[in-house]
C-alpha cells in the first residue's frame, strides 16, 4: 500500500473518530511560511493561530482557511503565547508547529496512527532534520535535537518561567515518533547572523 492510499484511509479514520486534533502555531510576520504551515495542518480538526499583531499579510493568508481561528495577543514571551494557544484549543490532542517547521507525508501518517493507537502516550517527542538555505545539515550536533510537538493538553503545560526555548511540563508516559520533522531553521547567512545576535 503506497503512502497516498495509506494517508487517505487514515485521514478518513480520524474524521470518523472521536479523537480530534488541534493544530497550533504562534506567529509574527510569517507571510512567507504560513501557507505551507496551514497545509501541514490540513488533517487537523481546527487550527489556532496566536498572532502578535503581524504587520505583513500573515493573517490575510491565514483567514483564507476556514479551519483557522485567530487570537491576537501582545507578545511578552513564547511560553505565554503557547499557553494561550492551548487555552483556546477545543481538543485534548494538540500539534504545535513553528513557522519554519514542516511535516512530511510519512510523519503525518504516523501522527494519525498514533492518535488512534490503544497504546498512545500523553506526549511525543519529534526529532528534527535541520536545513540551511533549503539544504539538509549533517554532522552539526543537531542530529539528536528533539522537541515535544504532539501531546494531550490535559496532561501538560508550558513552564511559565521559561522565556525562550520554553519547556513542556510533563512527568511521564512519553513517546518518540520515528519520522522526523523538517526544520528550515536558517534561510540565508544574514538570517543566521540576526538569529545569533537575537538569541545570544
What do the PLM-derived regions correspond to, one by one?
Residues 18, 89-92:
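Active-site acidic short loop of glycosyltransferases
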Residues 80-86, 93, 104-200:
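Catalytic-site signature of metal-activated, phosphate-bearing donor transferases
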Residues 25-43:
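Short, well-formed alpha-helical segments that are part of the catalytic scaffolds
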Residues 52, 73-75, 91, 98-101, ...:
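Short acidic donor-binding/metal-coordinating loop in glycosyltransferase active sites
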Residues 59-88:
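Conserved donor nucleotide-binding strand/loop of the catalytic core
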Residues 32-36, 56-64, 106-107:
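Acidic helix N-cap motif at the loop->helix transition within catalytic regions
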Residues 40, 51-60, 98:
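A conserved acidic beta->alpha catalytic loop
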Residues 20-22:
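Cell-envelope/extracellular polymer assembly enzymes that use nucleotide-activated donors
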Amino acid at each position: 500500500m503506497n503512502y497516498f492510499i495509506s494517508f487517505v484511509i487514515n485521514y478518513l479514520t480520524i474524521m470518523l473518530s472521536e479523537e480530534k486534533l488541534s493544530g497550533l502555531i504562534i506567529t509574527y510576520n510569517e507571510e512567507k511560511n504560513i501557507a505551507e504551515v496551514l497545509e501541514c495542518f490540513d488533517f487537523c480538526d481546527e487550527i489556532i493561530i496566536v498572532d502578535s499583531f503581524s504587520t505583513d499579510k500573515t493573517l490575510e493568508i491565514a483567514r483564507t482557511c476556514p479551519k483557522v481561528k485567530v487570537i491576537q495577543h501582545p507578545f511578552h514571551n513564547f511560553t505565554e503565547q503557547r499557553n494561550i494557544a492551548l487555552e483556546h484549543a477545543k481538543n485534548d490532542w494538540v500539534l504545535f508547529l513553528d513557522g519554519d517547521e514542516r511535516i512530511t507525508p510519512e510523519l503525518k501518517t504516523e501522527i494519525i496512527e498514533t492518535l488512534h493507537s490503544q497504546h498512545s502516550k500523553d506526549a511525543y517527542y519529534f526529532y528534527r532534520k535541520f536545513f540551511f538555505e533549503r539544504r539538509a545539515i549533517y554532522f552539526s550536533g543537531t542530529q539528536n535535537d528533539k522537541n515535544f510537538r504532539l501531546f494531550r493538553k490535559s496532561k501538560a503545560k508550558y513552564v511559565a518561567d521559561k522565556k525562550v526555548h520554553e519547556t513542556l511540563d510533563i512527568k511521564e508516559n512519553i513517546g518518540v515518533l520515528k519520522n522526523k520533522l523538517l526544520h528550515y531553521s536558517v534561510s540565508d547567512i544574514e538570517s543566521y547572523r540576526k538569529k545569533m545576535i537575537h538569541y545570544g
